[in-house]
Curated annotation (Swiss-Prot):
This is Ornithine transcarbamylase, mitochondrial. Pathway: Nitrogen metabolism; urea cycle; L-citrulline from L-ornithine and carbamoyl phosphate: step 1/1. Changing residue 225 to T: In OTCD; late onset. Changing residue 88 to N: In OTCD; late onset.
Length: 354
């Protein structure tokens, strides 16, 4: 038993429309887990080993089981505050973070560009130091990865990447949890990316091989992934004995793939490129024709919001589509990230197979 639990109330307490057993618990020394992430930043998954990423997924599954399935109330973040800086609007990132942090007993504080202008009204250095004195962690959704790097350098509290131009690590954690739930294991899966060489693809490239997953990615000419990311992904594939295929042919990328993945073709800040991008991405829509060359057990992922030109309704709303469980898992994975960076908690649930 990893924790000493003492039941304070035998009756269910009604909280937020759910019945929770209110328990008092203390975090003892982990008996099974050797991974310690407390105090770390989460800027990119390239900074984390396979075991560390697996630990965050394990913790995600644990919190989901204890809170959603068992109805427990776990105030692991009671008395803690989270600063949320959003230069880009969001549905899933904001809602999952705010509800998740509050569900764990903490207080999230949302700041938009009207409240805080990174590096404009106040330097990034000063902002980082002020936030460090008032919050326990910061989740920032920004245009430039370099801004996150500066915040992390100057802050004395964990900085979490809620999205940048280069990476979107918390989305990939949700994707992997969804796939683990569906396939029971990640090792040996082939991920087929069809779309832009963007922050989602970059985050997959920084992590898939660490799970023993293969990656086949198709992007239009001129929209390939970042060269430095590609170089590191090739190194990871070599170290882990996995396949990495980068092509401009969507059907080649989809061939034999277990998981078909795409994303928006036009990210926020690229609106002026819309006409050019729509032309460049002709032939990249995921359809049943794409699925015909995939593995017999194929599934589909999209981080949302989705446009019909990216994936047709037949695939998007099919029983093979995991997009809505994927969206829900944004909540459980960001909760796990915050718990792992801010507490000594270790999962009670048996470690899943990865």
């Amino acid at each position: 038993m990893l924790f000493n639990l003492r039941i304070l109330l035998n009756n269910a307490a009604f909280r937020n429309g759910h019945n929770f057993m209110v328990r008092n618990f203390r975090c003892g020394q982990p008996l099974q887990n050797k991974v310690q992430l407390k105090g770390r930043d989460l800027l990119t998954l390239k900074n984390f080993t396979g075991e560390e990423i697996k630990y965050m997924l394990w913790l995600s599954a644990d919190l989901k089981f204890r809170i959603k399935q068992k109805g427990e109330y776990l105030p692991l973040l009671q008395g803690k505050s989270l600063g949320m800086i959003f230069e880009k609007r969001s549905t899933r990132t904001r809602l999952s973070t705010e509800t998740g942090f509050a569900l764990l007993g903490g207080h999230p504080c949302f700041l938009t560009t009207q409240d805080i202008h990174l590096g404009v009204n106040e330097s990034l250095t000063d902002t980082a130091r002020v936030l460090s004195s008032m919050a326990d962690a910061v989740l920032a959704r920004v245009y430039k990865q370099s801004d996150l790097d500066t915040l992390a350098k100057e802050a004395s509290i964990p900085i979490i990447n809620g999205l940048s131009d280069l990476y979107h690590p918390i989305q990939i954690l949700a994707d992997y949890l969804t796939l683990q739930e569906h396939y029971s294991s990640l090792k040996g899966l082939t991920l087929s990316w069809i779309g832009d060489g963007n922050n989602i693809l970059h985050s997959i490239m920084m992590s898939a091989a660490k799970f023993g997953m293969h990656l086949q990615a198709a992007t239009p000419k001129g929209y390939e992934p970042d060269a430095s990311v590609t170089k590191l992904a090739e190194q990871y594939a070599k170290e882990n004995g996995t396949k990495l295929l980068l092509t401009n042919d969507p059907l080649e990328a989809a061939h034999g793939g277990n998981v078909l993945i795409t994303d928006t073709w036009i990210s926020m800040g690229q609106e002026e490129e819309k006409k050019k991008r729509l032309q460049a991405f002709q032939g990249y829509q995921v359809t049943m024709k794409t699925a015909k060359v995939a593995a017999s057990d194929w599934t589909f992922l999209h981080c949302l919001p989705r446009k019909p030109e990216e994936v047709d309704d037949e695939v998007f709303y099919s029983p093979r589509s995991l997009v809505f469980p994927e969206a829900e898992n944004r909540k459980w994975t960001i909760m796990a990230v915050m718990v792992s960076l801010l507490t000594d908690y270790s999962p009670q649930l048996q470690k899943p197979k990865f």
